[in-house]
């Protein structure tokens, strides 16, 4: 199993709307992807515009090729992308 960790910074004052958007995007879009196994979102206390998203995949390729290279990625970014203050920083772990 592969763990994707994405550090996300959103525009100030958008937390409530982003909370709804990320939940909707994960449950309606990302969860449809091949190899998707689950997710967890952590919100910053000292930095309320900072989120850490954990997504579990069967393989690295399920995320980097299947999801990111397919139509679901565009749907996901259409939902959450407008909130980003900067591009997310994404890394993978075993």
Which positions does each model-derived feature cover?
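Short, well-ordered beta-strand segments in beta-rich or mixed alpha/beta enzyme
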Residues: 2-9, 39-68, 93
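Short, surface-exposed ligand-recognition loops at beta-strand->loop->(often short) alpha-helix junctions
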Residues: 9-22
């Amino acid at each position: 199993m592969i763990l994707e960790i994405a550090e996300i910074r959103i525009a100030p004052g958008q937390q409530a709307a982003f909370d709804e958007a990320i939940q909707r995007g994960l449950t309606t879009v990302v969860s449809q992807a091949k190899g998707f196994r689950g997710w967890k979102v952590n919100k910053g206390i000292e930095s309320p515009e900072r989120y850490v998203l954990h997504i579990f995949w069967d393989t690295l390729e399920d995320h980097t090729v299947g999801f990111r290279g397919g139509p679901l990625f565009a749907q996901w970014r259409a939902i959450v992308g407008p909130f980003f203050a900067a591009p997310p920083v994404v890394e993978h772990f075993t």
